[in-house]
Amino acid sequence: MSLPATAPAAAPVPKMEARHLSVRYGEKLAVKDISLALPERQVTALIGPSGCGKSTFLRALNRMNDLIPGARAEGEILLDGESVFDRHIDAVELRRRVGMVFQKSNPFPKSIFENVAYGLRVSGLKDRAALAERVERSLVNAALWDEVKDRLGESALGLSGGQQQRLCIARALAVEPEVVLMDEPASALDPIATAKIEDLIHHLKARYTIAIVTHNMQQAARVSDQTAFFYMGDLVEVGPTEQIFTNPSEQRTEDYVTGKFG
């Protein structure tokens, strides 16, 4: 007796999705007709040589490119199925929902506590007990609490580079985003600090949808579920990370991930 056919596994639901996205800086076309979905609660790595458009694409997701004179985007970016370019969408609120962690840690010249509390105060949270609870929770989620809990009043500038980067992640998490964008968050860190960031990413994806730009192929392979390869403004290939690194469909992808250029 034949067994009933098994239905194919459903594709992961996209939390964010770009459809035919192009980005220009003046006359320069930096990203060309990109369609890419970020599955919910997965890590998507964006890889490719310098200048290929991956950071431009990342910044487009929460409209950070709007802050660059002459930058303009065409196409669609959807967050939970709603266009981020709709007139009623407030860019500040969008950047709360879609947080960003930059390559270079940028702590404010304030105390550790105030670095994390700053965005909460700006958004209207004034109650001291509630602030303290949110700051602690954010530092715990960023795997930094145990290292700083006894010196929250000290300057954040006294932290190590790796600690400063985790503080910036805590600051992004404090305002309760749904998506976290990371632009080479470990490129300036030593191997031990890098390992802590990578371990943190593994834990964060249980709660957040994450996209990370990295030049480090080993890092992309370790932390991501899906990998997208960019080259000269084009999205060459996207797929499950293991497939991209072991059996890519495109020769350019294979040449890049095996170090033949980059």
From Swiss-Prot:
Its main location: membrane. Keywords: ATP-binding, Cell inner membrane, Cell membrane, Membrane, Nucleotide-binding, Phosphate transport, Translocase, Transport. Residues 16-257 form the ABC transporter domain. It is found in: Cell inner membrane. It catalyses: phosphate(out) + ATP + H2O = ADP + 2 phosphate(in) + H(+). Its EC number is 7.3.2.1. It holds the Pfam family ABC_tran. One of its GO terms (biological process) is phosphate ion transmembrane transport. InterPro entries: AAA+_ATPase (IPR003593), ABC_transporter-like_ATP-bd (IPR003439), ABC_transporter-like_CS (IPR017871), P-loop_NTPase (IPR027417), PstB-like (IPR005670). The keyword Transport applies. It is a peripheral membrane protein. One of its GO terms (molecular function) is ATP hydrolysis activity. ATP binds at G48, P49, S50, G51, C52, G53, K54, S55. The keyword Translocase applies. GO terms for cellular component: plasma membrane. The complex is composed of two ATP-binding proteins (PstB), two transmembrane proteins (PstC and PstA) and a solute-binding protein (PstS). Belongs to the ABC transporter superfamily. Phosphate importer (TC 3.A.1.7) family. NCBIfam families: 3a0107s01c2 (TIGR00972). Part of the ABC transporter complex PstSACB involved in phosphate import. Responsible for energy coupling to the transport system. This is Phosphate import ATP-binding protein PstB. The lineage of its organism: Bacteria, Pseudomonadati, Myxococcota, Myxococcia, Myxococcales.
